[in-house]
């Protein structure tokens, strides 16, 4: 077997570097399944705005706390001609180590009993801090709010891409 010539080294080395970099790039922006469950409270500041706070668990985060701002932006058409609410929400989920994940949620809230609303919609990851800096992702939102007791429960299910550098 003969040793590689300078010309062969010049061709093979860049190919090996390109392969290594493509593997690192693929790993750096891999889309992963994401699930989050959260329970907490809702406090209305005005007839159309509220804050939320809760605790729960999320994949890639472990135990979390949540803080959100909710705005009713219009009416939603619900089953049996019930009138519900179209809602926009910004929520921040904080992991035990302090890393944060921020989301924008849009949902339709429809009454299921007096003062109790079921919400379905979508979420988009808008960023974060720590390992969630520059994160992206999206999925579905499902939740229930009992405005009589001021309690909420919600779930997010979708994907997240954590851009590791």
Segments (PLM) and residue ranges:
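Beta-strand-enriched cores of mature, soluble protein domains
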Residues: 27-165
């Amino acid at each position: 077997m003969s040793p590689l010539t300078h010309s062969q080294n010049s061709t093979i080395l860049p190919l090996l570097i390109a392969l290594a970099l493509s593997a690192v790039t693929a790993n750096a922006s891999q889309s992963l399944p994401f699930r989050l469950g959260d329970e907490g409270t809702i406090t209305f500041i005005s007839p159309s705005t509220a804050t939320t706070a809760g605790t729960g668990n999320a994949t890639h985060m472990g135990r979390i706390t949540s803080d959100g701002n909710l705005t009713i932006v219009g009416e939603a058409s619900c089953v049996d001609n019930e009138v519900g609410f179209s809602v926009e929400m910004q929520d921040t989920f904080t992991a035990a180590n302090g890393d944060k994940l921020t989301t924008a949620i849009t949902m339709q809230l429809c009454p299921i009993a007096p003062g109790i609303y079921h919400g379905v919609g979508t979420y988009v990851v808008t960023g974060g801090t720590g390992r969630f800096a520059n994160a992206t992702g999206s999925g579905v939102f499902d939740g229930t709010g009992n405005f009589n007791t001021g309690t909420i429960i919600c779930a997010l299910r979708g994907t997240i891409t954590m851009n590791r550098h």
